[in-house]
Design a protein with these regions (language model features):
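N-terminal alpha-helical transmembrane segments of multi-pass membrane transport
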Residues: 2-164, 171-176
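Helix-loop-helix module between adjacent transmembrane segments
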Residues: 17, 37-47, 52-61, 94-97, ...
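Alpha-helical transmembrane segments and their immediate juxtamembrane interface regions
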Residues: 165-170, 176, 190-193, 203
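Short membrane-interface loop/juxtamembrane segments of multi-pass integral membrane proteins
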Residues: 169-178, 224-228
Length: 229
């Protein structure tokens, strides 16, 4: 296994259980030049995702009306059929965060046993809001409940789009107001923070403690082994 620090991955401070792999960051990449621009791309990932995006854009532009109707129907079906899944999954993330806080796993130190924080709690909170959700909270904290409310009461007798978070409150202003606030709190309260925290924790653990590349695929290494690369 090559030295993680040589690949731009911070070496753990103190004892850490590194994962032994011969993979080196960028070993499967293809380097090329397009005019004055140099490209360094991961061949399988770039080819599959690039072709998928091109095909999607082409079909959408070629059949705009049909695509618009199809995407609208798909959105309505997904949000109407799997609303329970969205709510349940977000609640599971919150419960998982609470479990990690009170369980022995919460004592695992990111960066190794002897690692020390680079920033104070005040600095971390400032970065979380300034670079994370700050502008979203300032803007959508006001506009989102208004948008939800308007989508329920704007049309004639109060019919709402079926995908709106408060579609069932059509024609009832008081209920639309309450559900609009509830949907906004769900989108910007503890639930999104819990989702971000679990994903960030997984990335940090496998990179800073296990010595793997800072990518989502590293999280699946215990399951798929070398096939994740």
């Amino acid at each position: 296994m090559s030295d993680p620090s040589e690949q731009g991955i911070p070496a753990p401070e103190g004892p850490a259980n590194l994962i032994d792999t011969d993979y080196e960051v960028g070993q499967d990449n293809v380097e090329m030049s397009v005019g004055p621009f140099g490209l360094d791309i991961h061949n399988p990932v770039f080819a599959i995702s690039g072709l998928t995006i091109i095909a999607f854009v082409f079909v959408t532009l070629a059949f705009q009306e049909s695509a618009g109707a199809a995407f609208g129907d798909l959105r309505d079906w997904l949000t109407g059929t799997f609303d329970w899944f969205f709510l349940t999954a977000a609640n599971i993330f919150v419960l998982l965060c609470l479990f990690l806080i009170v369980s022995p796993y919460g004592k695992v130190r990111i960066g190794g046993k002897d690692a020390t924080p680079d920033y104070s709690y005040t600095g971390w909170f400032a970065m979380l809001f300034a670079a994370g959700m700050g502008i979203g909270l300032m803007f959508y904290g006001v506009s989102e409940p208004i948008s939800h409310f308007s989508s329920s009461v704007a049309e004639g007798a109060g019919s709402a789009d079926s995908w709106a978070p408060l579609g069932g409150a059509a024609g009832n202003n008081a209920e639309a107001r309450d559900l609009g606030m509830a949907a906004t709190i769900f989108h910007w309260g503890l639930h999104p923070w819990a989702i971000y925290a679990i994903v960030a924790l997984a990335l940090a653990l496998f990179s800073y403690n296990k010595g793997l590349p800072l990518t989502m695929r590293s999280v699946f290494y215990p399951i798929f082994g070398e096939r994740v690369w």
